[in-house]
């Protein structure tokens, strides 16, 4: 009987705290329906790796399953890149192609990344600061790739922060939007005219974006390339079954593995540190300033436009697709039930997906030596 319980002697309070954190993630996934495909495996994985002498992670010469998955899928950036194929297959760039000026909002909404880079550099070395700053894009795969390539010492905390803030978009964004806009601005109606987009344009778009991104930020080629490859599968018209597979089976399967593998970096000894709290705080700052950057850019444009834009659409310029666009539409209808700006918000949202990947590539170009 004593043998059965001797492992309890290896238990410490930090592990119990991580169980509670894992339980909180599972609660948010199930009860609040916040990114359940990610938060549930992350939460369960956090419990797995914080059991005393857990066989899920490498102990001495005994290799753990989650450690092997980490080496096979995250250490070489494979899981995030494969996930980008699925995300690309899900995205319809039609609203953006109908109104290309929306790309400007996606670019403006990356302001928080570079603001936080400057702030984080006061507390961390430049590579870690750059990795932390990318949390603001609300783009988990990009955060993982940038952190991994820059050999950040805080990969676990960065991954958890990036995906947690993605899930918390409906909670974080509305107060920021309301703080920066007036009721009159939030009730601005925007006329939407569906301009036809030819099949040729839809096919050429992912190819051209990949070429441009590769010339501007060569380090972003794998990120942009896999995203655009997924979109090309969607739009080419001859790979419908592959497109369906990429959107559903591939994306869901990789997301499950990604979520539980991220948890391998959530061991108590490495996670429960003051540095982690600071990273979570700086990641939140980056997220807030990304949202604010998009809104304030829209307000600036309104100073020069005859037909005003609803500044709330600027907040959709982060990479959290399609949550951010839906949040903006929900706020618009709350102020005025007849105000429908979903298509414009979606166009900005997909432009933010591209802009965040390119921003990540630019950061890699600056700091990867």
Functional labels for PLM-detected ranges:
Residues 1-10, 31-32, 44-78, 232-255, ...:
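Hydrophobic transmembrane alpha-helices of multi-pass solute/ion transporters
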Residues 7-18, 67-83, 128-136, 218-228, ...:
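Structural signature of hydrophobic alpha-helical transmembrane segments
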Residues 31-39, 58-59, 66-70, 91-105, ...:
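Interfacial helix-loop-helix linkers and transmembrane-helix boundary segments
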Residues 71-76, 85-90, 104-111, 115, ...:
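Alpha-helical membrane segments and immediately flanking helix-loop junctions
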Residues 96-116, 268-294, 345, 349:
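Entry/N-cap segments of selected transmembrane alpha helices
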Residues 153-171, 282-288, 313-314:
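Alpha-helical transmembrane segments
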Residues 164-238:
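Membrane-embedded hairpin module used as a gating/binding unit in multi-pass transport
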Residues 209-297:
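Transmembrane helical segments that form the transport core of multi-pass membrane transport proteins
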């Amino acid at each position: 009987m004593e043998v059965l319980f001797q492992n309890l002697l290896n238990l410490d309070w930090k592990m119990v705290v991580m169980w509670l954190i894992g339980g909180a993630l599972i609660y948010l996934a199930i009860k609040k329906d916040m990114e359940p495909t990610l938060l549930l495996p992350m939460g369960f994985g956090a419990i797995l790796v914080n059991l005393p002498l857990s066989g899920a992670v490498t102990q001495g010469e005994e290799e753990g399953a989650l450690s092997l998955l980490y080496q096979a899928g995250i250490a070489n950036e494979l899981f995030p890149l494969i996930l980008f194929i699925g995300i690309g297959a899900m995205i319809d760039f039609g609203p953006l192609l109908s109104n290309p000026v929306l790309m400007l909002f996606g670019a403006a909404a990356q302001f928080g990344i570079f603001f936080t880079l400057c702030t984080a550099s006061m507390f961390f070395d430049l590579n870690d600061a750059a990795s932390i700053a990318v949390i603001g894009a609300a783009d988990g795969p990009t955060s993982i790739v940038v952190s991994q390539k820059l050999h950040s010492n805080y990969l676990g905390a960065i991954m958890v922060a990036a995906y947690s803030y993605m899930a918390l978009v409906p909670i974080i964004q509305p107060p920021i939007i309301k703080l920066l806009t007036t009721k009159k601005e939030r009730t601005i109606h925007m006329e939407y005219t569906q301009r036809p987009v030819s099949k040729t344009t839809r096919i050429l778009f992912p190819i051209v974006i990949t070429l441009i991104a590769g010339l501007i930020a060569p380090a972003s080629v794998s990120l942009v390339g896999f995203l655009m490859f997924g979109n090309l599968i969607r739009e080419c018209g001859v790979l419908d079954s592959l497109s369906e597979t990429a959107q559903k089976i591939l994306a869901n399967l990789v997301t499950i593995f990604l979520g539980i593998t991220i948890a391998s970096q959530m061991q108590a000894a490495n996670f429960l540190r003051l540095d982690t709290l600071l990273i979570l705080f700086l990641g939140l700052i980056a997220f807030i300033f990304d949202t604010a950057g998009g809104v304030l850019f829209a307000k600036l444009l309104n100073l020069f436009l005859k037909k005003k834009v609803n500044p709330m659409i600027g907040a959709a310029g982060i990479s959290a697709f399609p949550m951010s666009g839906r949040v903006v539409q929900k706020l618009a209808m709350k102020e005025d039930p007849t105000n429908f700006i979903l298509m414009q918000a979606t166009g900005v949202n997909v432009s933010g997906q591209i802009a965040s990947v390119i921003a990540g590539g630019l950061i890699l170009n600056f700091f990867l030596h």
